[in-house]
């Protein structure tokens, strides 16, 4: 039986498809977007992180608080004046330190499921899906990187009459989509940048495959929601927004809505916990007027456009 690795099950989500949903965030992504707000979903492997606000190693009342250091057989943990450091070259992500930590300051990100286990967990909130017109959304990361697992879990979800959405960036081989689309009710598809060279600079790959997959999904007559992260210096210029709008209008007849998602810096602490650099470290949020301006450009060409997100 195939298993999957997830980094979160977000219950009572109202932003990842219609109604009240559970979003299954699957680990592993084929892109490296500079603005990614879920960097814990990039690696297909488990990650170890340290939460400074939870740590109690300096609390004299906690006699066992340094057990994390003692149980690490690889000597990958070091307590410094600045906090706990993780030698990621040594760490095997065995999880012993996280198990020993009484404050959950050390955490393993990545939970393994088989299809039967995951469906049983998802069905716990079935009443909320049914009363709200909601269901399950598979996102990430890039859920299509674990398409073998989706081929097992999606039919089980369909047997339970659940509405299924797929949140994808489109940067995987079409053959993977062809295997799962029959079970999917809605495809939420990311369109970030229309110029291929700019797309590659921002994400690590060209966008030819992405655009081709978007067309194929539309040709398969699957309802689509388009999502565009509006990011300063990357995607937010009016020329790019207008180009995406024309692509939606001219080539994606199945698009029901287009969400312009205002840049958020909420992912910044996650980068620090993973010892990753964050390219947008000092970039401020948009103002409401700036987002309204972007939306007007989009809506003039593609009236299905809307925007959401925090502003300053």
Sequence positions of predicted segments:
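Pocket-edge positions in alpha/beta enzyme catalytic cores
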Residues: 47, 83, 110, 142, ...
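Conserved Radical SAM active-site core
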Residues: 42-183
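Electropositive phosphate-/nucleotide-binding environments in soluble metabolic enzymes
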Residues: 23, 27, 49, 66, ...
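N-terminal cysteine/histidine-rich coordination modules
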Residues: 1-43, 47
